[in-house]
A protein has these predicted regions:
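N-terminal phosphate-binding or glycine-rich loops at protein starts, especially the Walker A/P-loop
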Residues: 1-30, 113-114, 120
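Short coil/turn connectors at secondary-structure junctions
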Residues: 6-9, 24-27, 49-53, 74-82, ...
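Short acidic, glycine/serine/threonine-rich loops at helix termini
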Residues: 22-26, 33, 40-43, 68, ...
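Generic structural signal for well-ordered, non-membrane alpha-helical segments
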Residues: 10, 14, 49, 62, ...
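Glycine-rich nucleotide/cofactor/substrate-binding loop typically near the N-terminus or early
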Residues: 16-87
């Protein structure tokens, strides 16, 4: 974070992460200040907003996109860093199903997919394992990236997304799949 701040990167975040960033003495804009919409449904909806996703998905080289983000006052978002809710750790902890379900990240996974889709213009860092490569890149080039670097981060992001969704599938398959298969087998006999 300090490296990003030193490079002149303006940070935008939600809730607890924003508080953490500010506790380090680094300024951070609240997502709610950009969207002019509060976090709702007990925090289930924070970043799912056109002013966030428009800023990520905007194609910088397409005049029509640039005109629309100007018209709707959407800030360009060039770097997305996501730390997904710990779904697998919550399952492994033996938590009950309501707690497990709350750890299915919707906004985070959507941010990852949007940023990875627009890797031509956006860097996506989808896991803590990618923090050091990002820091190394920033130290070497400043706050600029190559298409090859952005594409690598996008590939890694889709790997994180795929793994996360597979873990959720495996949870539901293990919990309900076995009961469904047993029911189907009972109907065959």
């Amino acid at each position: 974070l300090r490296t990003l701040h030193a490079q002149g990167v303006e940070l935008l975040s939600t809730g607890g992460t924003q508080t953490f960033i500010e506790s380090l003495g680094i300024p951070c804009v609240k997502v709610e200040d950009v969207t002019t919409y509060p976090s709702i449904l007990g925090g289930r909806v924070k970043t799912l907003h056109p002013k966030v996703f428009g800023g990520i998905l905007c194609r910088r080289g397409l005049e029509q996109d640039m005109q629309q983000i100007e018209k709707y006052e959407i800030p360009e978002i060039d770097l997305v860093i996501v730390d997904l809710y710990p779904f697998e750790a919550t399952v492994a902890s033996g938590a009950d199903e309501p707690a497990i379900i709350e750890k299915i990240d919707i906004g985070g996974i959507s941010l990852i997919r949007a940023a990875a889709k627009n890797y031509n213009d956006v860097v996506i860092v989808a896991s803590q394992a990618q923090y050091q490569p990002l820091r190394d890149m920033l130290m070497e080039h400043g706050a600029t990236t190559s298409l090859e670097e952005r594409r690598w981060f996008a590939k890694e992001a889709f790997a994180v997304s795929s793994h996360y969704d597979s873990a959720i599938f495996n949870y539901f398959d293990g919990e309900e799949g076995s009961a469904f298969r047993q029911s189907a087998n009972d109907q065959k006999t």
